[in-house]
From Swiss-Prot:
Heterotetramer composed of 2 alpha (TphA2I and TphA2II) and 2 beta (TphA3I and TphA3II) subunits. Part of a multicomponent enzyme system composed of a reductase (TphA1I or TphA1II) and a two-subunit oxygenase component (TphA2I or TphA2II and TphA3I or TphA3II). CDD domains: RHO_alpha_C_ahdA1c-like. It comes from Comamonas sp. This is Terephthalate 1,2-dioxygenase, terminal oxygenase component subunit alpha 2. The gene is tphA2II. Binds 1 [2Fe-2S] cluster per subunit. Keywords: 2Fe-2S, Dioxygenase, Iron, Iron-sulfur, Metal-binding, NAD, Oxidoreductase.
Length: 413
């Protein structure tokens, strides 16, 4: 493996080398140290594979994965890679099956990922076949540990990663339970191609500072302003975070107008304001909660729009974002209608999220030739802890704290 040339400067996580988004050797190391290392990768929703034989194909970083429920009702996950010549075992995005068979040479696997059959293993009419010493039990795709929390299915290649509850920590667990406290149903999906390194999008998710500055819809229609009540929670590892706020019409002030900030534009009006008319369903009054789990999971509640996002690296300068929109299984018809309408707030062409799909590409293009220079991430100081305000980059610094630990790039004492 080629050596990375990433150079970190300073004694804090307030300076991030632009080369971290463009160095291919570093990206190769991410696959081994992060995605196949001591992390829990989000794989799918438990409700997406409800019955025995139901499966989905997905990825842990670049590694293709099969997630399947067996007759014992347990969920199993293994590499989507035939032990013979490396072809994909399952080609469909989802389905139901009693077993899996590779199309290339018809090697077969059960729903726990065990190799159960080799075509013509004994040869034909006494000729050919596998040697007598060949043992199917010693061959097969790598298997992942599986953990389920609040209906979210996670997988890990590591035997050393702590339990999912310990990995998340109590505050993040509580905030996931707040949203996923009862059964959910999938009500929509999008897959979005992003023209940037995966870390630029995950920084964006954790960046409470940008939300009301980049997104005109947020600010103009008062869904999210830094003057509103809210805060940021960062777990001890730094890798997981929650940003939350509450709509407060009385919190509107002239601070955006005084600074001539583009995102506050009173000239814009909605022809159909019913988009913003929802219903109260959370007793704490929080109208926006964005939660992330390292290395690539997001759970959102924006008004009544609930969704999970899965971020996957695809190359040094591109990534994939899978959106899964959710409703509760006991939603009324009117509640489901509201969720579907408010789904237009986010996604590839969402009134809010459209800009997030573009701005990472602006950075990726802007840092060309600047690998030895640094991004400045100093809003709110140099710490990586929780904050009572959202005019801060503390959770972005937290991401880099966790990233550097997994990558063996910690600050030297």
């Amino acid at each position: 493996m080629q050596e990375s040339i990433i150079q970190w400067h300073g004694a804090t996580n307030t300076r991030v080398p632009f080369g971290i988004y463009t160095d291919t050797a570093n990206a190769d190391q991410e696959q081994q140290r992060i995605y196949r290392g001591e992390v829990w990768n989000y794989l799918c929703l438990e409700s997406e594979i409800p019955g025995a034989g139901d499966f989905r194909t997905t990825f842990a970083g670049e590694t293709p994965i099969v997630v399947v429920r067996d007759a014992d009702q347990e969920i199993y996950a293994f590499e989507n890679r035939c032990a013979h010549r490396g072809a994909l075992i399952a080609l469909e995005k989802s389905g139901r099956t009693d077993s899996f068979q590779c199309v290339y040479h018809a090697w077969s696997y059960n729903r726990q990922g065990d190799l159960t059959g080799v075509a013509f293993e004994k040869g034909v009419k006494g000729q050919g076949g596998m040697p007598a010493s060949f043992c199917k039990e010693e061959h097969g795709p790598r298997k992942l540990r599986v953990a389920v929390f609040c209906g979210l299915v996670f997988g890990s290649f590591s035997e050393d990663v702590p339990s999912i509850e310990d990995y998340l920590g109590p505050e993040i667990c509580e905030r996931i339970e707040r949203v996923l406290h009862k059964p959910v149903e999938v009500i929509g999906r999008f897959t979005q191609k992003l023209p940037n390194n995966w870390k630029l999008y995950f920084e964006n998710v954790k960046d409470s500072y940008h939300a009301s500055l980049l997104h005109m819809f947020f600010t103009t229609f008062e869904l999210n302003r830094l003057s509103q009540k809210g805060g940021v929670i960062v777990d001890e590892s730094g890798g997981h975070h929650v940003s939350y706020s509450m709509i407060d019409r009385g919190a509107k002030d002239d601070s955006y107008k005084d600074q001539a900030i583009r995102s506050d534009n009173e000239r814009y009006r909605l022809k159909d304001p019913s988009l913003l008319e929802g219903f109260e369903e959370f007793e704490d009054g929080v109208t926006l909660q964005i939660l992330s789990v390292f290395p690539g999971f997001v759970l959102q509640q924006i008004q009544n729009s609930i969704a999970v996002r899965q971020l996957l690296p695809k190359s040094i300068s591109s990534s994939e974002l899978n959106w899964t929109y959710l409703g509760y299984a006991d939603d009324s018809a009117e509640q489901r209608k509201v969720r579907l309408k408010q789904a237009n707030l986010i996604g590839p062409a969402g009134f809010i999220s459209m800009e997030d799909g573009a701005v990472g590409g602006f950075v990726q293009r802007g840092i060309a030739g600047a690998a030895n220079l640094d991004a400045v991430i100093e809003m709110g100081g140099d710490h990586e802890g929780s904050s009572e305000g959202r005019a801060t980059e503390t959770s972005v610094r937290g991401f880099w704290k966790a990233y550097r630990k997994h990558m063996g790039q910690e600050m030297q004492a």
